[in-house]
Every structure is written in C-alpha cells, then in structure tokens.
Amino acid sequence: MTFLGHAAFRVEGGGLDGLIDPFLTGNSMTPFSPGDFKDVNYIFVTHGHGDHLGDTPDIAKRTGATVVATVEMCGVLEGVKCHALQIGGAFTFPFGRVKMTPAWHGSGVQVGEGEGMVYGGVAGGFLIEVDGRRIYHAGDTGLTVEMGLLAEDGVDVALLPIGGNYTMDIDD
C-alpha cells in the first residue's frame, strides 16, 4: 500500500492494482501524477468532491480500469467502465471482496468551471479484502457507530480522515 497524499492510496496485491480517491493533479501533498499509473485495474471513489474523485476519469479512460462507486457517481462518469455499489452492498471481484460502508458527508460533483454541482449519491467508504487482509478506507466522514462494528469483525488497516471541520478529527 502506498500513500499518495490527501485521501489517495494505491493498493496492490492478489491481482489488484487499485487506486482509492486518486486526487493527484493540484494536490500539493503528492509527488505523483496521473500518468504514473499505467497498470491500474480498479479505482475506488468514496464520493464526488474534487479532492476525492480527482483524476479518476482520466486514469480510468487511459488504463481501462473499472471504477467502483455509487450508482449516482457511475451515472456522472461518462466513458468509463463502472461497477456500482451502494452502502451495505458488497461484490466479489477477481482479486477479492469489496463492501461499501456508510460515511457522513456530502457528495456533490463539480460540473464545469462555475457551473455548480450535481448530486453524486451518498458518500461512502470501502472495506477491501485482498490477499487475506481487510483494508478499510472511511472516505470523508464523521465518526460513525458502524466503525465499531467493522472493528469487531476485524480490520487490518484503517485509513481514517483526521482533518476536523469537514470530517472527524484525530481525537475521534
């Protein structure tokens, strides 16, 4: 697993070369650019805000990667292969199982410069099972009761927001 800055991560193993929330262009926290990812086969998008959706369309179109997101986000993303999940839904992909988890946050998608936002469905997180490990990416969210349920089931790696103001904070 590689931290790419902000909420972006790369997860590799078991046939998965995946990106989570690939906000790279304009992200001062990353040395990476979209062109650095040539073999990505899945992209997981927690919600539609630009600092999470990021470079998803460009990378997905260039690599042929499948985007995993809500049905509403899949409807907004044109010209990409998309697998829709909703909160509580799960699917077994060739590399392993993915479950979409609840998040308390918005999910508007910016459409053009100064044109406002369109509805991008609910925000979520992902529990990704690959190579015998369970990776939980919470997306942007406040603290939720469901996080405790995930902990009871066992999570090997938890990727949690700690920014405060728009999300939970380090004290949570």
Where are these regions (language model features)?
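Catalytic phosphate/metal-binding cores of nucleic-acid and nucleotide-processing enzymes, i.e., regions
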Residues: 1, 42, 68
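Cap/insert and terminal regions of metallo-dependent hydrolase folds
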Residues: 68, 145-172
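Mature N-terminal segment immediately following signal peptide/propeptide cleavage
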Residues: 2-12
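Pre-active-site segment of Zn-dependent metallo-hydrolases
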Residues: 10-49, 54-58, 72, 106-118, ...
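A short helix->loop->beta-strand "cap" motif at the edges of active sites that frequently abuts
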Residues: 16, 62-66
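Active-site-proximal beta-strand elements of phosphoester/diester hydrolases
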Residues: 1-4, 18-21, 97-103, 134-140
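Metallo-beta-lactamase
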Residues: 69-133
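Short gly/ser/thr-rich secondary-structure transition/capping motifs
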Residues: 1-3, 23-30, 80-84, 139-141
